[in-house]
């Protein structure tokens, strides 16, 4: 008798076959008949199809869906979940890998039928996954459970929203996902955050504190457009959630996009923040006078000096992955 699929590992990808191969390989030894992998390919032109089909000949629980056009990360993940058979779906990144033991743990938690959402902690690694930068992305000493009462959900929002900007940590009830407005968040690149926080969750949230994901840093495809994501999309999204007050939202991100001075300095240091972009954001957000003035000054600072300053700052903060990224633009 065929067992019901409990967990679908959903991966949206585009032209990153070499990393996708590593990601899928990390799951293969842990797969059983209660788990499937769904790969949604946003019109890749590399050998993604061949690689996934080779895996599927070894294990028929690996499924491949090719899209005629790239819909963007939000839409492509949504398509993956719509085609998934599992009770829960893990929105896994195509360039990271999982560690042994996580799938058995997730199955155990899913079968308890207590949770709407499970978050998996991660380690931070370099591009080649051979040097660890940080032991845990989410600094929890032990597993946590957030209940369904309002204060618990507010605590979850304040404690975990920053980490939730990483889509690969999310394991979510598929019925919950499909019941919520998703199209609203297409183009934000944070659809999962919108789905989770647009309303309070009906069941508890479980945080796995042990890091079972290895995140490959300095490999994001969206570096050039990241300034729009972090300066415009992210604050707009966080401040759109009606169930959380201003104090809670401010703990995540300031409402005024141009008041993110450290982030603006970073983007100036890599040459993405300039007077033209400043004007675009100013026209969209109407910042206060001091915020407008300070952010404008940042937009015209010497890029090389900003880069040097921020590399020193990253060294003080012990963030070597940031230094590596900055060196590319020095």
Question: Which residues does each PLM region occupy?
Answer:
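Nucleotide-sugar donor-binding/catalytic module of glycosyltransferases
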Residues: 1-233
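C-terminal subregions of glycosyltransferases and related glycan-biosynthesis enzymes
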Residues: 194-197, 201, 207-330
């Amino acid at each position: 008798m065929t067992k019901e699929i409990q967990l679908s590992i959903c991966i949206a990808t585009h032209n990153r076959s070499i990393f996708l191969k590593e990601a899928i390989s990390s799951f293969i030894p842990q797969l059983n008949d209660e788990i499937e992998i769904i790969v949604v390919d946003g019109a890749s032109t590399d050998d993604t199809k061949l690689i996934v089909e080779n895996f599927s000949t070894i294990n028929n629980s690996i499924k491949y869906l090719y899209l005629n056009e790239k819909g963007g990360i939000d839409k492509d993940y949504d398509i993956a979940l719509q085609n998934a058979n599992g009770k829960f779906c893990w929105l896994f990144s195509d360039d990271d890998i999982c560690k042994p033991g996580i799938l058995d743990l997730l199955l155990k938690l899913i079968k308890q039928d207590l949770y709407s959402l499970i978050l998996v902690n991660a380690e931070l690694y370099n591009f080649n996954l051979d040097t660890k930068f940080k032991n845990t992305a989410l600094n929890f000493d032990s597993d946590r459970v957030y209940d369904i009462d309002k204060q618990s959900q507010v605590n979850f929002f304040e404690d975990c929203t920053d980490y939730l900007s990483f889509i690969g940590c999310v394991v979510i009830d598929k019925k919950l996902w499909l019941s919520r407005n998703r199209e609203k968040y297409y183009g934000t690149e944070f659809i999962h955050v919108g789905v989770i926080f647009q309303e309070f969750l009906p069941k508890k949230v479980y945080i796995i504190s042990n890091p079972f994901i290895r995140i490959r840093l300095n490999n994001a495809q969206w570096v050039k457009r990241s300034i729009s994501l972090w300066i415009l999309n992210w604050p707009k999204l966080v401040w759109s959630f009606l169930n959380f007050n201003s104090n809670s939202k401010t703990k995540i991100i300031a409402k005024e996009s141009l008041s993110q001075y450290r982030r603006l300095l970073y983007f100036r240091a890599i040459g993405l923040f300039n007077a033209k972009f400043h004007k675009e954001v100013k026209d969209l957000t109407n910042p206060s006078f001091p915020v407008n003035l300070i952010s404008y000054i940042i937009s015209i600072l010497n890029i090389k000096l900003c880069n040097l300053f921020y590399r020193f700052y990253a060294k003080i903060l012990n963030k070597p992955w940031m230094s590596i990224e900055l060196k590319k633009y020095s």
